[in-house]
C-alpha cells in the first residue's frame, strides 16, 4: 500500500491489527504484558489504538505529564484511578472530600461500599471552607491509601487550598488523586504540585463541544500507568477511536476556548451581582466569594473558571421556586437546561432538582458559561431576570 504523508494521525477504526507472522505475534503478545503506553506493535484496539495514543499525547502536553490514559467516560476514569490501589484483603482505607461530583459520591456508596465492601471515609466542608484541623485528624486516624478531592467543588465552587492539602496528605504517606475537571490544566496542573494522579471528565472542557463522552487519567509514575492500562484493557474502559479522533481536533483549541470561558464568566458574574433580582452570586473571582483568596493563590491572573452559581431573591421557598422556573422558561430557546457543563454554548442547571437534600435551595441555578459574545449573554440573562 502506498504511504500517505498525512499531517494528522489518521482515524484507525480497526478492531485488530495485522501482525503478519507467528514470530511477530509472539513478540507482540510478550511485550503486551509490560503494558507500555505506546507499543511497538498494536494488537487489538481494546489494548491500545494509535488514534487514541495520539490524543493522549496531546493531553500529556497540556498536563506536562509522562502519561495519559483515555477512557470512554469520566466515571470510567474515576473507576480506574481508585481501583488500581485496591489489593483484595490488603486494601487500605481511603478518604474522599464530600464536596465532589455527585456521580462520584454515588459510585462510592453503590460500588465501593455496597459491592466491594471497602473502608471509605469522607471529609466534609464547613460553611464553605475546609477545616484543616479536622482533615489532619482524619488522616492521622484513618491512615488512608489515598486522599481524593476536587480543586473546585460543584456546585458551590469552593476552591481548595490544594498545596496545603497535598502537603498534609504527604505527611501521612497518602497518595493524592485530584479531579481537576473544573480547574483544567489551563488553570492548574496538580501533578506539578505533588499529586499522584489527576483525572478529568474530558466530556467537559477538554472536549468542549458536547458531542463526545470521555475521561482521562494522567500521571508520572510508570507503575501506576501500567496498572491503569491493564485495568482499562481488562474492563473494556476504552474510548472509541472515532471519539479519540474528534477529541484530538478539539484539544487544539482548548486553551483559547478556556480563556474565553473564564473571561465571559468573570464579566457575567460581575453583571449578575448588580442585578436586583439576584440574592447571591458564587464565583471564585468575586471578592464576595468565601474562597477567593484560595482561588487567587492557585490560579493567579489566568482566570477563575467558567462556572457560576447564583440564587434568585424570593419571599418564600415557593416564591423562589416559581421565579427560578420563570427564569428557565424565559431562556428555553437560547440557554437550554442541559445536565452537563464546559460546552462552547452557555447552558444552565437548577440546583435543588438535581442535588435535592444536599442543597435544598429552590432559587439557585448553575450556569456553565460559554464562549458566545458577552454582550449578547448579558442581554439574554438580563431580559430573563426582568421577567421575574
Report the location of each language-model feature:
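Conserved PLP-enzyme active-site core in the AAT-like
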Residues: 5, 12, 67-277, 282
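PLP-dependent enzyme catalytic core of the Aspartate aminotransferase-like
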Residues: 66, 115, 120-122, 126, ...
Amino acid at each position: 500500500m502506498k504511504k500517505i504523508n498525512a499531517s494528522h494521525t489518521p482515524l484507525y477504526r480497526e478492531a485488530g491489527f495485522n501482525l503478519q507472522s507467528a514470530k511477530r505475534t509472539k513478540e507482540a503478545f510478550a511485550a503486551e504484558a509490560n503494558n507500555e503506553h505506546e507499543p511497538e506493535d498494536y494488537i487489538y484496539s481494546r489494548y491500545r489504538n494509535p488514534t487514541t495514543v495520539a490524543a493522549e499525547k496531546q493531553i500529556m502536553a497540556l498536563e506536562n505529564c509522562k502519561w495519559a490514559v483515555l477512557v470512554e467516560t469520566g466515571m470510567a476514569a474515576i473507576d480506574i484511578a481508585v481501583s488500581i490501589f485496591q489489593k483484595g484483603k490488603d486494601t487500605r482505607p481511603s478518604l474522599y472530600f464530600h464536596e465532589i461530583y455527585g456521580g462520584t459520591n454515588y459510585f462510592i456508596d453503590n460500588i465501593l461500599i455496597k459491592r466491594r465492601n471497602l473502608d471509605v471515609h469522607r471529609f466534609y466542608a464547613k460553611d464553605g471552607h475546609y477545616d484543616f484541623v479536622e482533615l489532619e485528624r482524619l488522616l492521622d486516624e484513618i491512615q488512608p491509601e489515598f486522599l481524593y478531592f476536587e480543586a473546585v467543588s460543584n456546585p458551590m465552587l469552593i476552591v481548595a487550598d490544594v498545596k496545603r492539602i497535598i502537603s498534609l496528605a504527604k505527611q501521612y504517606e497518602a497518595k493524592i488523586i485530584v479531579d481537576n475537571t473544573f480547574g483544567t490544566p489551563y488553570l492548574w496542573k496538580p501533578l506539578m504540585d505533588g499529586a499522584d494522579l489527576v483525572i478529568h471528565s474530558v466530556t467537559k472542557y477538554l472536549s468542549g463541544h458536547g458531542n463526545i463522552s470521555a475521561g482521562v487519567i494522567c500521571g508520572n509514575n510508570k507503575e501506576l500507568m501500567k496498572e491503569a492500562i491493564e485495568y482499562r484493557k481488562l474492563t473494556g474502559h476504552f474510548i472509541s477511536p472515532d471519539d479519540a479522533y474528534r477529541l484530538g481536533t478539539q484539544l487544539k483549541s482548548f486553551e483559547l476556548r478556556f480563556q474565553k470561558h473564564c473571561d465571559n464568566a468573570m464579566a457575567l458574574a460581575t453583571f449578575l451581582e448588580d442585578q436586583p433580582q439576584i440574592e447571591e452570586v458564587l464565583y471564585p473571582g468575586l471578592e464576595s466569594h468565601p474562597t477567593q483568596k484560595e482561588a487567587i493563590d492557585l490560579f493567579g491572573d489566568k482566570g477563575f473558571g467558567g462556572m457560576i452559581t447564583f440564587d434568585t431573591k424570593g419571599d418564600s421557598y415557593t416564591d423562589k421556586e416559581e421565579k427560578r422556573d420563570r427564569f428557565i422558561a424565559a431562556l428555553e430557546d437560547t440557554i437550554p437546561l442541559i445536565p452537563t457543563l464546559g460546552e462552547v454554548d452557555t447552558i444552565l442547571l437548577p440546583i435543588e432538582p438535581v442535588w435535592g437534600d444536599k442543597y435544598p435551595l429552590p432559587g439557585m441555578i448553575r450556569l456553565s458559561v460559554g464562549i458566545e459574545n458577552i454582550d449578547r449573554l448579558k442581554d439574554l440573562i438580563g431580559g430573563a431576570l426582568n421577567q421575574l
